[in-house]
From Swiss-Prot:
The keyword Repeat does not apply. This is Phosphatidylethanolamine N-methyltransferase. The gene is CHO2. It comes from Candida tropicalis (strain ATCC MYA-3404 / T1). Its main location: endoplasmic reticulum. It is a multi-pass membrane protein. The keyword Cell inner membrane does not apply. Keywords: Endoplasmic reticulum, Lipid biosynthesis, Lipid metabolism, Membrane, Methyltransferase, Phospholipid biosynthesis, Phospholipid metabolism, S-adenosyl-L-methionine, Transferase, Transmembrane, Transmembrane helix.
């Protein structure tokens, strides 16, 4: 689409030169102070004025308050009126109601607005629809909005000299200020009301040392929370704090920032950014405050998952090539596990896999059956310890033997077992033993519950211990999933112990995902779930198990895994500083000591970072309308064609090479389509363009196209011309299509071609292997030649397909066309899993499949006749 090309060009110029692009927006700001450059999603550039955070804006007496800010302050202080009510329990109920209202307004109100702003630019569209920033609009709402902006920015601020997107963001900020400040204020009111309840219960009914410990511990959490917020704001500024990237982009801010607190924790504003809430709960000694904090934090994580993360992926996500590489690596990862996701715990369970069923039976036996029939808790404890010791010794010894002597690999090769199979066998053994240990631990605690035996160490604060224990268990589960997501199943099952580095797709240790923050996340969080079990049920037996788990985890990581990693990847690669270490050094350790302690190699700092450009990111904002499920009749499609509306037009489009049929003219999938155009020479623009579209997606309008052409277009530089649409400029699916002639780089339609159909070619699979040669040539001509340039039916497909930007999509296209053309389903993984596969091999596979299907059909019908 031409407009996207222009936007990319503008962004490229702004990113690669210090000279400002001479756009209309910039020319209006030449005399203004320089600041960060912004660009709207329509391509308009401007200088982003300085703004202040909500606390400074609302509470700094030196800053003039806007109209909305005065209203916000009034609403905040109005909460104090509730304290005039003498009944404190009623106050608590009222404040909780207020908090729920503001929290829902935050996560679902702001969330809804941001989601639609991200997908549809809703807020900006409202501003345009109601002309909120038009000086000539005398509507009350427009005057109110313009008055608010003037009161924010001053009378010298020229509203029309800034994009609508920026002005809309300024108004949206006040809406955010109201909700966020009200949310926090009502929560503090809940904390205070609960603390003073029952004659200041938060400092009574406890030993003084415990009370002081609560207050100090809670205060530390609150101060840490404050530092997180301040550091985060100093890092990302107002632009990201107020979700500015939902409205416009800042030049040279095309990548996510990993600095300060963002280098220590994933999504710190949503994760550790709420620990202060739990600090308030600790100080107030109130389960009501704790539940309120959990409620607010839970809703915030929902907001992160459904609103923030999708937008982050859309704007800052990896490029198409990086996504493609990740997909390939994950699929290649499964080659070591029979192309199926291996069992981790009981995750990825498959009833058709015998090892999975055996794992389930053993887990149920150790976790349920044995505890139910056990005569004493001592026997359960001995079983748990024995199982853990057996797992620890056997796994550790095997890893040492494999690392030092390649014991497992030599045994596999001597028995003619491929090394990939040896890793799969190891994975089954490793996971089975891990499952036994955790099942035994679960069975031990189930035995306590069934026999009604209480804790022998601590009996108080059960609900608090339950909450903290469940949090630790969840943390271990989440960390494990994050580790798998970062290093794959290959890394989870110690794949680099079994597969040579030259044959592995992993050449370096990852610094992505959870490993961005910690070098060894499993060392800290790998057994925190067992600590959680002890916290919930603090017995001597559980304490012993907890220590046993921790010691084994420490030994395995530091004396087995780390030594092997250093041998393979090098000491500098293994010992380089994690995000947490870097931040602690930066803020707490003097520079002189830092330089002596640093593990970073200076040569590393010259490396090129893998990132996405703003131009690539903007691709995600050219919205595609979804394919309609409405089925249109052929006659209806003809009625929708341009020929009935522009019969006397001076513009013409004609399509060459279409085949005749009883209904619409047609061509086959992948066949190049040549289109000719004709336009009046006196009005022709070199920016006129022709695009290819599916009719069911453009039937809403014959005069304007609002759907992205997704690259299927070409400029009409001359008033008459011919262009052949082929390969990436074609649709590779069946349907009814049309060409549209657009004027002057815009989306106004001057002419629409006759509708035509794209069909799958029909290829008959022979039943005799002797015909494989001719069949291979037919596959090459009708399918493969349309997608890749392959010379021979015996040439490997992979090296040529890998030259494409997205090899996964190429393989999927192969399988789709073959399946539709031959009526035999073929999975794209046959191309991915065999680098030497040729067209001839594909032909033989199809013939073999047909022969098997014919035999099965024959036997089936034969049985019916008996």
């Amino acid at each position: 689409m031409p407009s996207l090309t222009q936007t990319r060009s503008t962004v490229s110029e702004l990113n690669t030169s210090a000279i400002e692009t001479s756009t209309m927006s910039d020319s209006g700001h030449q005399n203004k102070p320089k600041g960060p450059k912004g660009i709207t999603f329509s391509g308009e550039t401007f200088i982003v004025p300085e703004t202040h955070d909500m606390v400074k804006t609302l509470f700094d007496p030196t800053i003039k308050k806007s109209n909305f800010e005065l209203i916000i302050l009034g609403l905040l202080f109005s909460n104090l009126l509730v304290f005039l009510i003498p009944n404190n329990n009623l106050r608590i109920s009222i404040f909780i109601g207020f908090y729920i209202f503001w929290r829902l307004s935050y996560n679902f109100g702001i969330g809804w607005l941001l989601q639609h702003q991200s997908n549809d630019h809703l807020l900006v569209q409202w501003a345009i629809k109601y002309k909120l920033f038009d000086k000539n609009n005398k509507n009350f709402l427009a005057k109110l909005v313009q008055s608010e902006i003037k009161s924010q920015r001053g009378d010298a601020y020229d509203i029309n000299s800034y994009p609508i997107e920026f002005n809309t963001w300024l108004i949206f900020r006040k809406f955010v200020d109201l909700i966020l400040m009200s949310d926090f204020t009502t929560f503090i009111c809940v904390v205070y009301a609960c603390s003073i309840n029952n004659d200041y219960q938060f400092i009574k009914n406890q030993p003084s040392w415990l009370t002081m410990s609560r207050i100090v511990g809670g205060s530390i959490l609150i101060l840490f929370n404050y530092w997180v917020k301040v550091n985060a704001h100093n890092t990302i500024k107002d632009y990201a704090w107020y979700w500015g990237d939902f409205f416009f982009r800042q030049i040279n801010n095309e990548e996510l920032i990993f600095d300060g607190v963002f280098e220590m924790f994933p999504h710190p504003m949503y994760s550790v950014g709420y620990v202060g809430y739990y600090g308030f709960a600790l100080i107030s000694k109130s389960y009501i405050v704790l539940l309120t904090a959990i409620f607010g934090h839970f809703l915030q994580m929902i907001f992160l998952h459904y609103i923030e993360n999708p937008h982050i992926d859309k704007i800052y996500g990896p490029s198409k090539n990086e996504i493609n590489l990740i997909k390939i690596l994950k699929l290649k990862d499964l080659k070591n596990f029979d192309n199926l996701k291996p069992l981790v715990g009981l995750y990825n369970f498959n009833w058709m896999r015998a090892s999975d069923v055996i794992n389930l039976v053993l887990s149920l036996t150790y976790g349920l059956i044995i505890p139910v029939f056990a005569k004493s808790l001592k026997s359960l404890f001995v079983l748990t310890v024995a199982t853990k010791l057996f797992e620890s010794l056997s796994i550790n010894i095997l890893l040492i033997l494999q690392s030092q002597f390649k014991f497992f690999t030599k045994w596999s090769l001597s028995n003619d077992i491929p090394i990939e199979k040896s890793l799969n066998n190891w994975a089954v053994l490793y996971n089975s033993l891990i499952n036994l240990t955790y099942s035994s631990l679960f069975g031990l605690n189930l035995g306590y519950f069934l026999q009604g035996t209480g804790s022998s160490l601590v009996t108080d604060y059960f609900y608090l211990r339950l909450f903290l224990g469940l949090c630790l268990i969840y943390t271990q589960s989440w960390i494990n999933l994050s580790i798998i997501d970062s290093i794959g199943y290959f890394g989870w099952f110690y794949g680099d112990f079994f597969i040579p580095k030259s044959q592995s797709s992993i050449k370096n240790l990852t610094q992505a995902g959870v490993y961005r923050y910690l070098n060894n996340p499993e060392q800290i969080f790998g057994v925190c779930g067992v600590m959680g079990v002890f916290l919930i049920h603090p017995t001597v037996e559980n304490l012993t198990c907890c220590i046993l788990w921790m010691v084994n985890n420490f030994v395995r990581i530091n004396f087995i895994e780390k030594i092997h990693m250093i041998r393979i990847y090098g000491e500098k690669e293994v010992n380089r500083d994690s995000g947490v270490t870097k931040t602690v050094k930066k803020h707490l350790i003097p520079d002189v000591i830092q330089r002596k302690m640093s593990n970073d190699d200076p040569k590393r700092r010259g490396g090129v970072a893998n990132g996405t450009s703003l131009g690539d990111s903007l691709d995600n904002f050219i919205k595609e309308l979804r394919n309609s499920t409405t089925k249109l009749s052929q006659q209806k499609l003809i009625e929708l064609s341009q020929n009935l509306s522009f019969a006397n037009s001076n513009y013409k489009l004609s399509i060459d090479g279409l085949k005749e049929s009883n209904e619409l003219k047609y061509t086959t999938i992948g066949t190049p389509i040549t289109v000719s155009w004709q336009s009046p020479s006196n009005t022709h623009s070199i920016r006129d363009w022709v695009g290819l579209y599916k009719i069911v997606q453009t039937s809403y309008s014959r005069n304007k196209t609002i759907l992205s052409s997704a690259g299927r277009w070409t400029y009409c530089t001359d008033s008459k011309g011919v262009f052949t649409f082929e390969k990436e400029k074609l649709f590779w699916e069946e349907g009814v299509y049309e060409f549209r002639y657009h004027l002057d780089g815009k989306h106004d339609v001057a002419y629409i071609s006759e509708p035509f159909e794209i069909k799958s070619v029909d290829i008959d699979v022979p039943g005799d292997i002797s015909e494989a040669g001719e069949f291979s040539k037919q596959l090459k001509t009708e399918i493969f030649d349309k997608i890749i340039d392959i010379k021979s039916i015996n040439e490997s497909i992979a090296p040529i397909a890998n030259q494409a930007d997205n090899v996964i999509e190429v393989y999927k296209l192969f399988s789709s066309l073959i399946s539709k053309s031959t009526q035999i389903n073929v999975n794209y993984r046959i191309f991915l899993n065999n680098d030497n596969l040729s067209i001839s091999d594909v032909a033989h596979k199809l013939i073999d499949i047909k022969q098997v299907l014919q035999e099965l059909s024959f036997n089936s019908s034969e049985k019916k006749n008996l």
